[in-house]
């Protein structure tokens, strides 16, 4: 079990490329933290600095109050699972899982106990005598997880462990890793570019862009209260819709739209002196409904109707704006069809058009 403190962490390479910039985060014991962001945002580099595989250029890394900057990787009490399984093909599942413990010269009885315990948790007992070539991708990933589990480390680090699996296996392994966290009751830090993995697995999500932390929070918080337009657009699938316009009286207006703003949001916009200035309204696809209400109704034309089974994703054109609408599958929708959509303005978000920071 472990607490981590990352204080003003920096990573600067010899060519002066600044990959991680002033990273600050307190991680409590037993948390499941997910670093998420696009490729090149610095999430894997940060993980590797925690593991001791990358040198920290500036700042301090503390584990249970002890400064770890100069402590070698093998002495940090950390276990890591990589994107590639990195299994020894000539060894059995048992020997792959036991290899690290044998290198530490741990007693055979202890090794046997730990390997069998991990295999039981991961559903690998019947595969212990097989070699990796006889396993599926999901089973190989479980072996890689098992190899980390048997170390009984204080912190588990996972660097995009599911990216090599097909879609169905990823969903299955996502749930298995969440269950594993509950069983082990230990601190886990997980890196992914997949916001769905972040939303479904994390205690808290750390969203990064260009080496800078954009927001830290529980999944529901970052989804419902994004700190800026990047977070709002990155978290959620399909992404949040954005419309540029201005505030005129109690209306959000563009050249073709006029939508009434709820009083609570309008009061915040007034205190932030956002009236008559360029502003961006954001609204999620599920907060635009294909049925008319008393106000905030707009005519839209469907360009693409995607049926996912339980619902439709409607790609529509609304007064020159491209908007995605999430609709139930009770009705049929077709490309070229004209529909009336309703904006639930109680759920909309407003961002400063210049800074892209959330206003309300």
Swiss-Prot record:
Keywords: ATP-binding, Nucleotide-binding, Transport. GO terms for biological process: carbohydrate transport. This is Uncharacterized ABC transporter ATP-binding protein YcjV. NCBIfam families: PRK11650.1. CDD domains: ABC_MalK_N. SMART domains: AAA. It comes from Escherichia coli O6:H1 (strain CFT073 / ATCC 700928 / UPEC). InterPro entries: AAA+_ATPase (IPR003593), ABC_transporter-like_ATP-bd (IPR003439), ABC_transporter-like_CS (IPR017871), ABC_transpr_MalK-like (IPR015855), ABC_transpr_MalK/UgpC-like (IPR047641), Mo/tungstate-bd_C_term_dom (IPR008995), NA-bd_OB-fold (IPR012340), OB_MalK-like (IPR040582). The gene is ycjV. ATP binds at residues 37-44.
